[in-house]
Amino acid sequence: MQAKLIIGNKNYSSWSLRAWLLLREAGIEFEEHRICLDVEGCAEEIARFSPSGRVPVLLLDGQPIWDTLAIAETVAERWPEAKLWPQDPDARAHARSISAEMHAGFHALRDAMPMNCRAMGRKVALPDALTSDIDRVIAIWSDCHHRYGGSGYGDSGGWLFGEFSIADAMYAPVVLRFRTYGINLPDSACSYPERLLESSAMQHWLAAAESETEVIEREETGQ
């Protein structure tokens, strides 16, 4: 099966990161096609591949799958050997729940703290809605660490459910947001960001983001 992933700028496109990381960690070979966002002609180029006019979109033998969660579910279905959801039914239900929560929510966090891989030490105001989103993410990570971080579960790989899952792809951009804007984490929530950032796939993505020269001014938030 031929797989081609259409993504946006690696520095800014959080949904592109989710789909890309999922494929890389699953060990799936794919062609990458990057479209520079927010420039003349980008909408027309995206529309060549994506019925929704958004990235990412995954082409499997030419068939488009758009929306990151749809991509994730399709990949998990087509490549069951990748075990992209936890094998335990209760853990799998938990992983699906927090993935859907990230997919549908955290609007204050998205608006106030856009992903910007190159930026470090940025500061933004923390109104109540944003603080609530941050606290909820920390609670999710801490709960996963408590439930699944012990020896004997998922080989204790340091991911949210021991081994890499779709949930990790969904929360990866939040790790980068917290890094960019200097969000302090309690000890119970620190191990997951550390695990993600040290992975070879994330190191590859960050290096590519660093090498990009495009600047999207509306994404350059904070001082």
State each model region's role:
Residues 89-90, 165, 207, 211:
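Short capping/connector residues at structural and topological boundaries
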Residues 1-3, 139, 219-223:
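Basic/polar N-terminal segments that are highly enriched at the extreme N-terminus
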Residues 188-223:
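Long hydrophobic alpha-helical segments typical of transmembrane helices together
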